[in-house]
């Protein structure tokens, strides 16, 4: 799941060096809520990291520090911008991003709970939904 980038960065950054240094072709896909699509619909520009405008201006994919996202169940994913490092990686095409509708994320979370016996957090359901999309693409294409 992707809110500001720490979760995504923590899991993907250790592996990205293989793509950069060794020419591997691993895909890194961030899954963000469609109601707060800073990576898929935001602009790469300098913006404040906080709503009040107290931080220095930072280069990021952003919806604008005044953006007020809809109230969604995954409250941790409502941040207006993406971290500086993640933003640069997306700008440099070293990663991808998809947006996930809330209902699709909940359906994926229910499927995961039924199959694995673990109830995921609403935020994590976005990443699960993206994984289900990828699995279905592979099923269709062979």
Report each predicted region and the residues it spans.
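Glycine-rich ThDP/TPP pyrophosphate-binding loop and its adjacent helix/strand module
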Residues: 1-25
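Glycine- and other small-residue-rich loops at beta-strand/loop junctions that grip anionic moieties
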Residues: 1, 98, 120-123
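C-terminal structured "cap/appendage" subdomains that terminate the fold
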Residues: 113-142
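Alpha-helical scaffold segments in soluble metabolic enzymes
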Residues: 10, 14, 76, 107-111, ...
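Active-site/ligand-binding loops adjacent to catalytic centers
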Residues: 20-25, 30-118
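Short glycine/serine/threonine-rich phosphate/pyrophosphate-binding segments
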Residues: 3-12, 38-40, 124-131
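Basic, gly/Ser/Thr/Pro-rich low-complexity segments located predominantly at protein N termini
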Residues: 8-11, 15, 54, 58, ...
């Amino acid at each position: 799941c992707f809110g500001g980038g720490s979760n995504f960065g923590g899991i993907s950054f250790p592996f990205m060096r293989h793509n950069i240094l060794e020419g591997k072709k691993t895909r890194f896909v961030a899954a963000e809520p469609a109601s707060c699509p800073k990576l898929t619909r935001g602009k790469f520009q300098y913006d404040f990291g906080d709503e009040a405008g107290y931080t220095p201006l930072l280069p990021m994919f952003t919806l604008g520090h005044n953006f007020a996202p809809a109230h969604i169940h995954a409250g941790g994913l409502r941040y207006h911008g993406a971290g500086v490092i993640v933003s640069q990686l997306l700008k440099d095409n070293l990663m991808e991003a998809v947006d996930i509708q809330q209902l699709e994320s909940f359906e994926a979370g229910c499927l995961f709970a039924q199959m694995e016996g673990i109830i995921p957090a609403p935020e994590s359901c976005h990443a699960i939904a993206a994984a289900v999309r990828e699995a279905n693409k592979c099923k269709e294409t062979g």
